[in-house]
Every structure is written in structure tokens, then in C-alpha cells.
Amino acid sequence: MTAMNYPHAIILFAHGSRDALWRRPIEAVANDMKQLSPATQVACAYLELTEPDLPTTVAGLVQTGVNAIRIVPMFLGVGRHAREDLPLLLQDLIIQYPGVTFELSHAIGEEPEMTRAMAAIALKSNP
């Protein structure tokens, strides 16, 4: 990967878990994104208990020449992690990488498309 191929990237940021199976849905979303948009570099990062963490993921992307990163919190709602922990991490990254533009999206669960999709899935499983 070079800067020419991937000047922008999207990081799917999730909580993390000691259970290795927990990360599969997040990685599945990343893989689907890569198939839908091969020109978009997509990576996963985790707050705790799972690697890589956000600073490690950002460092790897910057090394490939990425100069703009959008972080998508893969949380259903805005709890303490999305409201407090992630903005603090982001502040540190902005200082560490002044040449990189960072954008923080809303928590994925707050997006109307996501709430509609969850409603449809829940209704589908209704006997």
C-alpha cells in the first residue's frame, strides 16, 4: 500500500474483549467495506483487551502514507467510551500527527440506517 493508493482511511473502533470470537463481526464489517470499496483502506482498532489499539492502528496507516483518517465508533450508543475515552485518545493522536486530518463519526448505533436495520432484523426473528 502506498500513499497514492490510500491517502484516506477509515478505522472501525470497537471496545474489545478477551474472547477472540468477539472481534469477528467487526472484522466482517471491515471486510465487507473493503469489498464494497476496494479503493478505501479500512482498519480495525480496539479500546482495550484486543489488539491493535487505536494508536498502533493510526501509526500503521500513517506509515503507508495515509493523511486523513475517519474513525467510526462501532458502539450502539454513546456511553462513556464514545463520549470520554475516544475523544481523549483522539486529542493525543491529533497532537502526535499534526499532518493528518482526523474525523470522528457518530457512534454507528445512532445512525438511522443502523437502527432501521436492527429493527428489521429483530422483526425478522419474530415468530
Residue ranges and their predicted role:
Residues M1-P127:
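Active-site-proximal alpha-helix that buttresses catalytic centers in soluble enzyme cores
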